[in-house]
Amino acid sequence: GPRTELFTRDQNNSLNSFRMIYIYTDGAASGNPGPGGYGIVMISGKYRRELAEGFTFTTNNRMELLAVIVALEQIKSPGSAVLVTSDSKYVIDSVVKGWVFNWLKKGFKDKKNPDLWRRFLKIYKKHNVKFEWVKGHNNHPENERCDALAVHASKATKLKVDKGYQESIKKPKGLL
């Protein structure tokens, strides 16, 4: 892939050269809501890492968003230049069109997934993140790989509980 060299000054004002970090993500939930998972491919220079995790009961959008969060949380140096490639219009439009910043101002009133959006904003601020949308299932090799990782993770025998989602759908219990 293309190699982009970027230069930043660190605290000691010495010149640092580092490579662009490419992140590919995908989320899946069968039944939506249902068992779900996310898949991540991270590439920087010769470095490549794949991550995936499955959950018992969640939504497609939560998995798409969680994939981006988890990937960004792996990055050690603050201020890294990152390109996130995703097929999720939900995630990309919410950030690129600035909706999520308005939701935050209004305390995420009547908005879904506030737990994940708050976690996203915390890590998003630390880096220089750009987004690129790709059409899903369109023979984009890294995106296809993420899809396979996400689906495979969602079918694992030991799945985690998506606590944030479970909390959000709990019905308030009436007084007996």
Where are these regions (language model features)?
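RNase H catalytic domain
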Residues: T25-P35, I69-R145, L149, S154, ...
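Intrinsic low-complexity, intrinsically disordered segments enriched in polar/basic residues
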Residues: N12-S17, M63, V100-W103
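N-terminal amphipathic/basic-hydrophobic helices that include classical n-h-c signal peptides
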Residues: G1-R19
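Short, mixed-charge aromatic SLiMs
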Residues: I92-D93, K170-L176
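Compositionally biased amphipathic helical and low-complexity segments enriched in hydrophobic
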Residues: F7-T8, N16, K122, K160, ...
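RNase H-like nuclease fold core
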Residues: F18-R62, L66, E73-S80, A148, ...
